[in-house]
From Swiss-Prot:
Gene Ontology CC entries for this record: cytosol
InterPro entries, per the entry: Aldolase_TIM, RibuloseP-bd_barrel, Trp_synthase_alpha_AS, Trp_synthase_suA
Name used for this protein in its record: Tryptophan synthase alpha chain
Family under the similarity heading: Belongs to the TrpA family.
Length: 277
């Protein structure tokens, strides 16, 4: 299933977890729990030591994953060991992509990602202006390249991003780094309005933490929701409390179902989405 196909039957729920957080085996269980909870696409974080786009919650997840031995090679093994059927997106930083393999450049990393079943990438530190080599490699191996659009992104820069993006566009619901919030930013509506004329699914992320958030965002016109910190919080709490992996996985599945149900409820409050051509 392609990423765009995952958005074709209603709002897509796109959860994020850092691969290997807090350890390899538990993390496999947690990611698989997200699919049981209704995930349509799963973003897997390949940890980098300087995650500039992340708030404290995901930064701590990155630390736990790195301390557990996660590397690009181990990440690809992790993807192969997963028992899921939904599309997987690798969220990582360009340094790791560029330096993988015997020669610098993105092609070896993208080739390996395609081999193990990754469908696309989110690379927060890679501007659209510098994405040409990665875009070419993704085109060669049939992978998507997702870009993040901030509330301040407009004009020529927005056009440049939307020329490069495929799969879906990651719409930042507010300014700043990632993290679960108690309310939804009013910038969400204006961000979605700016993207109306672009024919690519729009998934809103940054700060979504419950079903009410999901419902409001989808009712506002989003094609999907991206949720990270609220789920990573569950992993962190379970790790700190010494809870067993099955218990934590059950909590993740419960929140995933709430978020998915919220998204579906939001879709029922808006006119049918026009067919994409």
């Amino acid at each position: 299933m392609s990423l765009e196909d995952a958005f074709s039957d209603g709002p897509a729920f796109v959860p994020y977890l850092a691969a290997g957080d807090p350890d390899y085996e538990s993390s496999l269980e947690y990611v698989e729990a997200l699919e049981r909870g209704g995930a349509d696409v799963i973003e897997l974080g390949l940890p980098f030591s300087e995650p500039i786009a992340e708030g404290p919650t995901i930064q701590n997840a990155v630390v736990r994953s790195l301390e557990g031995g996660m590397t690009p090679t181990r990440f690809f093994e992790f993807v192969e060991d997963l028992d899921v059927s939904v599309p997987l997106v690798c969220m990582t930083y360009y340094n790791l992509i560029y330096r993988y393999g015997d020669e610098p450049g993105p092609r070896p990393f993208v080739e390996k990602a395609a081999e193990v079943g990754i469908e696309g990438f989110v690379v927060p530190d890679l501007p659209a202006e510098e994405a040409g080599p990665l875009r070419e490699a993704c085109d060669e191996f049939g992978l998507d390249l997702v870009f993040i659009v901030a509330p301040t992104t407009r004009g020529e820069r927005l056009d440049r991003i939307m020329e490069q993006v495929s799969g879906y566009v990651y719409v930042q619901a507010r300014l700043g780094t990632t993290g679960a919030q108690s309310s939804v930013s009013d910038q969400t509506d204006s961000s979605l309005e700016r993207l109306t004329d672009y024919d690519v699914p729009k998934a809103v992320g940054f700060g979504i933490s419950d079903g009410d958030h999901a419902e409001r965002i989808v009712a506002s016109g989003a094609d999907g929701i991206i949720v990270g910190s609220a789920l990573v919080d569950i992993v962190a709490e379970g790790h700190e409390n010494g809870d067993d992996a099955e218990t934590v996985a059950d909590r993740l599945e419960t929140l995933a179902r709430e978020l998915e149900d919220g998204a579906v409820a939001g879709a029922s409050q808006r006119p049918p989405h026009p067919e994409r051509t």
